[in-house]
């Protein structure tokens, strides 16, 4: 049974590599993989998730020598993301500074941010990791946005293990178009509607 699973895993990897062009559309790729695999293992169901249609929180910093420093360009795009998600504009700068401080490697607080020593004085103790996020839920540790505001952005944020910010246009839909709108400021809602 174990050898069969290993062979199936190898088959899956080979299929993914040889069909990578056709699998750019996640749902299409998921269907094709399930069709191919179900002929060999009928009980196996494959689900693919495209993480290139969300705003990568880790893109708010960039590598510089051996540390991470804030990425001002992506910070401006994140403020646009907050704006199109109708988050109170008075919170944008402070929230962004808190994110920078939790992700960057230095010990210097941003204007509205806080590093570890500043968090200790807070009733809701929350030490910043000073490293890339492992999971998007770490944004909750900042205890800054209301639950409703967090729910507005949560489906469209992610924490990928890199500092890249990109969007897979093949995955564009009515649930994630605000991400594309925020990272491509030259596009209008009308442009995006035409693409969808």
Name each model-derived stretch.
Residues 1-196:
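Compositionally biased linear targeting/interaction segments
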């Amino acid at each position: 049974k174990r050898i069969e699973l290993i062979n199936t895993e190898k088959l899956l990897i080979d299929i993914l590599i040889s069909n990578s062009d056709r699998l750019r559309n996640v749902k299409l790729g998921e269907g094709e993989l399930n069709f191919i695999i179900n002929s060999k293992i009928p009980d196996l169901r494959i689900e693919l998730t495209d993480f290139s249609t969300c705003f990568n929180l880790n893109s708010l910093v960039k590598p510089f020598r051996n540390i991470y420093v804030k990425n001002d360009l992506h910070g401006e795009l994140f403020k646009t993301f907050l704006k199109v998600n109708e988050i109170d504009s008075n919170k944008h700068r402070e929230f962004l500074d808190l994110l920078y401080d939790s992700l960057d490697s230095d010990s210097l607080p941003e204007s509205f941010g806080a590093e570890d020593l500043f968090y200790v004085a807070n009733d809701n103790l929350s030490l910043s990791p000073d490293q890339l996020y492992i999971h998007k839920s770490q944004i909750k540790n900042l205890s800054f946005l209301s639950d409703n505001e967090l729910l507005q952005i949560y489906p469209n944020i992610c924490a990928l293990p890199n500092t890249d910010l990109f969007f897979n246009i093949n995955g564009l839909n009515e649930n994630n178009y605000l991400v594309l709108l925020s990272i491509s400021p030259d596009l209008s809602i009308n442009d995006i509607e035409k693409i969808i």
